[in-house]
Amino acid sequence: IPPAKDGLLPKTFELINEDEPCAGLEEINDYFNELHISDGLPIIPPTKARYEKMLEYCPFDEDMVLCDPSGPSGKCVTVKDVAIAAVMAGCKPKAMPVLVAAFKALNNKAYNLNQSVTTSHPGGNLVLVSGPIAQEIGLSGKQGCQGPGWPVNATLGRAVNLVIMNVFRSVPGVCDLDCIASQAEFTYCFAEEPDLAEWNMINEDHYDSETTTVYVLKAEPIHDVIDFLSLNGHDLLDTITHCCSTLGSNNAYMPGPLVVCLTPDHGKMLKKDGYTKEMIQEHIHTYCYHEVPMVRNR
């Protein structure tokens, strides 16, 4: 079933079968995989009806450019590209405002988009949403939020990576130069949880509690921090700091931004011992380093 000139699949009435409603889905997925316009997981066919439904939650013109030309293809990303990927990923239309904001953020020069879509580092395109829209659409920051079982997290993050593959043509093993890649390149999306936050969330730091913000970062896969014995915030913070730049990680050699996710009990411990968010940030950025002999010739 070749796509139409506009890149969308035609309405596939010929595949409708009352005895087998999903007849043809396997063939569609095989076709997308052959063209390297899928991530290997089953996709929802981006029919015209589904595409138009997705745009109902997007007030922008479908040809509006969200990202400048980048990546191996040298193409720009439009609202249309994002809506198609959102359908394929299984997103609900309510996710469109977050996706549009995410690609506007990816277009910020500080993100270094062109390098991020071809790097050999197996990082994913982390999307962190703060504010009321996250809760309205079901985006989670609760226990297990970066694993399976959270459909909004999974599909929204997946849509971001489908756009990067399909529009920028950052195809694994071709122009995506990861050595073995990682699960973070399938999906990497979660929210700040207001009921669990011990300090202001990102949206409150920059705007207010009624505004929703979308923060993006090219980030390595989850780096677990294990500390069973610390009984005070200072010792716990030292453990966290040491994990932020372990030898062999990018941050040991090329310092960059960090996202530190605190569990509720760790957040409570740090706040109880008098730490503010700014104090935690300052501590990490002061002590997150290695002595020169440790990194020389590595």
Annotated model-derived regions:
Residues I1-R298:
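Non-transmembrane, aqueous-exposed alpha-helical and coiled segments at domain scale
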